[in-house]
Regions:
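Non-catalytic interfacial helical region
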Residues: 170-187, 196-211
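ATP/NTP phosphate-donor binding region
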Residues: 2-183
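C-terminal charged capping/lid subdomain of soluble metabolic enzymes
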Residues: 51-76, 81-87, 262, 268-271, ...
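A glycine/threonine-rich phosphate-anchoring loop and its flanking beta-alpha core
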Residues: 198-291
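Short glycine/serine/threonine-rich phosphate/pyrophosphate-binding segments
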Residues: 191-198, 219-220, 336-337
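Solvent-exposed alpha-helices and their adjacent loops that cap or buttress functional pockets
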Residues: 114-115, 177-179, 202-204, 231-232, ...
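Residue-level signal for inorganic ion chemistry
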Residues: 101, 122, 213, 251, ...
Length: 448
């Protein structure tokens, strides 16, 4: 068997067009400058996959100014609090806003306008509940006495992201006699958001839900885009559904109670956006990582906003991960193998993604697809964020191969990977690579 894997599908992307920099989508150059017009429209690529291959055409689609501009909205609303910045996830009649700002739980109208029935179920965990459950209940019920709020408190941790824990959500929903007009609210990090979203997608064949992410990881990544699900003992996120929320409310004040390790974990996903599609953002991160680690409010707000803009644009173009969206999984194939092989909860998700990103970058360099300077810059920025760049000693080549064989990106028995290729800010999603480079990377990082 040849050492070269092959695939008919290869995808090349760059940074978001709204950032006024030249780039590539599916290997084709976009205009050098794409900006907001006076009519409030921005050009956007329309991507179609047909029998003859990929075709890209330029269309003009309405996008709310809040999703296309780079200026933070600092206006003061009627409540006396600053109005949030809004990033729109453009999915036609299923579009929804991401509200970003401080003191958003003190602006109850933001949540209440997305609750359409009279019953709400808050899904949270035993770490977040003592800190924010009462505040969210107040935000849902202040001036809104007809709404009835129930809650279910789950154990905290990735190891509880399973079917047994999910059943506790269904038990509470059924015991509370919730109907199809109810709303589920995910209050917590990525584990809670994924489980609550999957519960909402499944309960009575689908009810509304809202995301209130409380970690950097959830705020910049998992709460946006509608990926929901649970883990299986044989692999991470193998059971789930695409199911979009009514809105995402990101109150940056919630990060004040986030442990340092959880804070750093989230920055792995932030760095990812710079590597795969937004080189200018990566350069900003290199200069501002210390401010982010010190929880500088303005730096955090900007990093969250820019990350959400990147995620929202990709999701708007490829909701169901048919190609473009898969590139958001840089480092995740290796990272998921680490989480599964080492044991769920031993490392935080972002820690595993950081180490997985280093492996993906190493493999990209072995393929001669990137310059060695990029390898060093990735190591340096992850070290700044105090994230791991080596593997747990117990990980073996055999463990990686076993777990990656059932990865969601395997197609017809072929493992497709997200790798960097070209200048910083460009990547490919492909199965067309020299298998020896993958083997060499695995043996370089594993002791056996």
């Amino acid at each position: 068997m040849s050492s070269t894997a092959s695939s008919s599908f290869s995808l090349s992307i760059a940074k978001p067009s709204s950032f006024h920099r030249p780039g590539f989508y599916f290997g084709l150059r976009l205009p050098n400058s794409i900006s907001m017009s006076s009519e409030g429209f921005v050009p956007r690529s329309s991507v179609e996959l047909n029998r003859s291959g990929l075709r890209v055409s330029q269309t003009r689609s309405p996008i709310r100014a809040s999703a296309a501009t780079q200026v933070m909205d600092l206006s003061v609303g009627e409540t006396g609090f600053k109005a949030p910045t809004i990033v729109e996830v453009d999915l036609g009649d299923r579009s929804y806003p991401i509200y970003i700002g401080s003191s958003l739980l003190h602006q109850p109208e933001l949540l209440q306008k997305h609750v359409h029935g009279k019953k709400v179920l808050i899904v949270t965990n035993n770490t977040v509940a003592p800190l924010y459950l009462d505040k969210v209940v107040d935000a849902l019920t202040t001036g809104n006495p007809n709404v009835s709020v129930e809650h279910v408190i789950l154990p905290d941790g990735e190891k509880y992201k399973d079917m047994d824990t999910l059943m506790k959500v269904f038990d509470k929903a059924i015991e509370s006699r919730l109907d199809r007009r109810c709303t589920f609210v995910a209050l917590g990090g990525g584990v809670i958001g994924d489980m609550c979203g999957y519960a909402a997608a499944s309960f009575l064949r689908g009810v509304n839900f809202i995301q209130i992410p409380t970690t950097v990881m959830a705020q910049v990544d998992s709460s946006v885009g509608g990926k929901t699900g649970i883990n299986h003992r044989l692999g991470k996120n193998l059971i789930g559904a695409f199911y979009q929320p009514q809105c995402v409310l990101i109150d940056t004040d919630m990060l004040n109670t986030l442990p340092d390790r959880e804070l750093a974990s989230g920055f792995a996903e932030v760095v990812k956006y710079g590597l795969i599609r937004d080189a200018e953002f990566f350069e900003w991160l290199e200069k501002n990582m210390q401010a982010l680690m010190a929880r500088d409010p303005s730096a955090l707000a900007y990093a969250i906003k820019r990350s959400c803009e990147n995620k929202a644009e990709v999701v708007s173009l490829d909701e169901k991960e048919s190609g473009l969206r898969a590139t958001l999984n840089l480092g995740h194939t290796f990272g998921h193998a680490i989480e599964t092989g080492f044991g769920y909860g031993q490392w935080l998700h972002g820690e595993a993604v950081a180490a997985g990103t280093v492996m993906a970058v190493d493999m990209s360099y072995r393929l001669s697809w990137i310059d060695k300077s990029i390898v060093k810059r990735v190591h340096d920025i992850l070290n700044q964020a105090k994230l791991p760049t080596t593997l747990p000693e117990t990980m073996t080549v055999e463990m990686f191969n076993s777990v990656m064989a059932v990865d969601k990106k395997v197609a017809d028995g072929l493992l497709r990977l997200i790798l960097l290729k070209g200048p910083l800010g460009n990547c490919v999603f492909t199965g067309d690579y020299d298998r020896k480079a993958l083997d060499d990377t695995l043996h370089a990082f594993c002791k056996s």
